[in-house]
Amino acid sequence: AYLNFPFFFIRSVAYIFGWWYASKRLIALSRQEDVEGGLISYKRSITLSAIFIVFFGYSSSMMAWDWIMSIDTHWFSTLFGWFVFSSMGVTGFTMIAMISIVLKRKGFLKYVNENHIHDLGKWIFAFSILWTYMWFSQFMLIWYSNIPEEVTYYMARWDNYNALFWITSIINFIFPLLILMSRDSKRNFGYIMTVGVIVLIGHWCNVFLMIEPGVMKEHWNIGFTEIGMFVGFLGLFLLVVNNALSKAPLFVKNHPFADESIHHHI
């Protein structure tokens, strides 16, 4: 009953609408703050953000159950929602860092410096470790318990996706760990861009491994369909981001912590 089409459709619409509404409302409050000043819009944005964090925590986990975990119909994991959430966190902070660096190099974000990128690098590092923790916890518990209904999920990936399975795990853990452990590497724009590209590739492979074995079984390949979908959604993402960036100033005017952000130093 949970996965019947009407209820599934209603949940999917609720997720997307909730995320869309929160983003639009936060943007509107930020622009209103630029025009009016004061603390009213700022306090409203804080309240909305606090509510949205709770909503996103629940909705992102349920989205993972509905859109990904349900592909392997008879398998479930109570960690799966957090596993997907941590992957979303890594890729989200990675894209923020990479876009910020590109805009900085183009001269659009003159206030951004290595201190701001350092903070983003710490978030990328932290979420990479969180992703690894979730990955290992899920894997170890299922492997140790050795329950047939659970191990089938990993057997399908070991038997037919073995190389990609281990390469993905190494890329998403070892690479960020070794490169971003030091302070200097998190402050280096070139390092962050390089790590960002590798991390995005690694988490694309992670999504591929979550979906493809349940859909194609052993008959899989990375061909024009997979690459085309990736390029298509990347193009759509860049179109939406560029369109949004072109419609508003890239730096706030009346935010109470604007000066503190400009002079941020760590």
Each PLM stretch: what is its role?
Residues 5-168, 255-258:
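Long, contiguous internal "core" modules enriched in hydrophobic/ aromatic residues
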Residues 23, 236-248:
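Membrane-water interface at the C-terminal end of transmembrane alpha helices
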Residues 78-84, 149-169, 188, 216-241:
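Membrane-interface transmembrane-helix boundary segments in multi-pass integral membrane proteins
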Residues 97-100, 104, 170-185:
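Alpha-helical transmembrane segments in multipass membrane proteins, preferentially the mid-helix core
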Residues 99, 210-219:
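A cytosolic-side transmembrane-helix exit/cap motif
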Residues 133, 176, 207, 249:
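Hydrophobic, well-ordered secondary-structure elements that form the walls
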Residues 190-201:
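Central hydrophobic cores of alpha-helical transmembrane segments
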Residues 250-266:
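Short, highly charged, low-complexity non-transmembrane loops/tails of multi-pass membrane proteins
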